[in-house]
Amino acid sequence: MSLLVVGSVAFDALESPYGKVDRTVGGAATYFAVAASFFAPVSLVAIVGEDFTESDEAIFRGRHIDTDGLERAAGKTFFWAGRYSENLNERVTLATELNVFAGFKPRLPEKYKTSKYVFLANIAPDLQRDVLKQVKGRPKLAALDTMNYWIERTPSDLRETLRHVDILMINDSETRQLSNEHNLLRAAKHIFKMGPSTLVVKRGEYGAMMVDKRGVFCVPAFPLEEPHDPTGAGDSFAGGFMGYLAGAKDLSDATLRRAMIYGSVLGSFSVERFGLERLRVLKRNEIHTRARHFAKLTQFKL
């Protein structure tokens, strides 16, 4: 089934101890769409400026990504620059230029309005809610990402939007901030009262955790000798997770657990190079091979 994603397409300038790139295509919706397209067709809604060329858009071609929802506006594309510390865990933002993204008002093409799987990437909660209103009927699965900025600045708007989604996908610090609870399991109980029935906590180098009424499932981060750039890891994880679910067409506990593995697989490939360099050349057989390696990471007998 087709998977709708609404979020940012951007240009990034990235620097880490492993090198730097001055201008590369990025943005949450970009990483998500590329990762998800390995499993299911993706419908993309985002905005770019006049400086976003045909060659920049090439990342979406040949990947079952429909870009009819990619709006082009007068002005420049959203730009972000950041530098990572030696261990890649700390990030300094060097520049944020919203440009045309500041006026982004998502409008779904008619053919997108019947999407059964919806992912609302990190944009203002009122815009996320407006997207859901444009979808005809209740999606089979709606998931949402947010950040500390919206938790702090628009808490009421965020709470209202959370009432309409099934899955909340955020990192551990955002989970604690949203719930006012340090323990992640207790935090999940608070968040369930806000609307979502499933919480997926992205924990960086410590992996990811899924909590729902059936229990807890944790996956480790895949061990890598030389990770280069964590910028798109979380969005690639989300893309792998949601893409697998859309492709599987069922939401059983076993399917959700496998989706966690495939999300972690896509996130691990993303960090191997700068920007989208690794996902650009990634093959499906590599994904499935790494998924099998994931299974062996914690396999043991009692």
What are these regions (language model features)?
Residues 1-4:
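Extreme N-terminal starter segment of soluble prokaryotic enzymes
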Residues 11-23, 38-120, 133-140, 288-302:
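Conserved N-terminal subdomain of the carbohydrate kinase-like
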Residues 27-37, 132:
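Histidine-anchored nucleotide/phosphate-binding helix
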Residues 33-42, 244-246:
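Alpha-helix C-terminal capping segments
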Residues 34, 80-83, 207-211:
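Short beta-strand scaffold segments in enzyme catalytic cores
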Residues 56, 127-134, 156-160:
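A short acidic, amphipathic alpha-helical/loop segment
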Residues 136-140, 148-218:
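Conserved phosphate/ATP/ADP-binding segment of small-molecule kinases
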Residues 184-302:
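Conserved phosphate-binding/catalytic region of the ribokinase-like
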